């Protein structure tokens, strides 16, 4: 496989390349992830840079990790599953709702043309923006705000990925999809959700596919939950 873009790397990133390979082969490929672009991007992006320093030794393990503000960086497999379900293409413009530490946006940015990502916690948004600059991932735009409202001035999008659990599919986000566009979101209660792929049909309707049960922190916003409890 060839890298699509060269990422800014530090020595510690190269030293942990073996851990990334093990993560990809043992956690992703063994569970059915097949998209070459997703696999290559997750081999490239230094996941450990997106977790707090005191947790970096666990960055490539099979599970989520706390990143502050009551939020988490998702399990590697779930990140791969959601991005693969988005069916990303090199020319795509993608919106992410729930930046967190920025890992999923970073993985997406190595695959698609441009990523717009919204985070409701300013501290996380600022941290992600700084990290993107450090890694020279210059095709990611970060905003602080209510992600359930989307990014109207940048719409429509080829894909939208929601990295928090919603009580229902946010209709505003569906309206910001291009015809043929895909939205991937966990939908359900505050404990368990069903991971859904919503595709906007050419006639304006929507087709929904279920991928399985997941657990995400709540999507808080006007078209989400009104609090986290």
UniProtKB/Swiss-Prot annotation:
EC annotation from Swiss-Prot or TrEMBL: 2.1.1.77
GO molecular function list: protein-L-isoaspartate (D-aspartate) O-methyltransferase activity
Keyword NADP listed: no
Active-site positions on this chain: 74
Reaction catalysed by this enzyme: [protein]-L-isoaspartate + S-adenosyl-L-methionine = [protein]-L-isoaspartate alpha-methyl ester + S-adenosyl-L-homocysteine
A Pfam family annotated for this UniProt entry: PCMT
Domain of life: Bacteria
InterPro entries: PCMT, SAM-dependent_MTases_sf
GO cellular component: cytoplasm
Intracellular or extracellular location(s): Cytoplasm
Record has Cytoplasm as a keyword: yes
Keywords: Cytoplasm, Methyltransferase, S-adenosyl-L-methionine, Transferase
Cross-referenced CDD domains: AdoMet_MTases
GO biological process assignments: methylation; protein modification process; protein repair
Entry similarity comment: Belongs to the methyltransferase superfamily. L-isoaspartyl/D-aspartyl protein methyltransferase family.
NCBIfam families: pimt, PRK00312.1
Chain's role: Catalyzes the methyl esterification of L-isoaspartyl residues in peptides and proteins that result from spontaneous decomposition of normal L-aspartyl and L-asparaginyl residues. It plays a role in the repair and/or degradation of damaged proteins.
UniProt protein name: Protein-L-isoaspartate O-methyltransferase
Species this protein is from: Pelotomaculum thermopropionicum (strain DSM 13744 / JCM 10971 / SI)
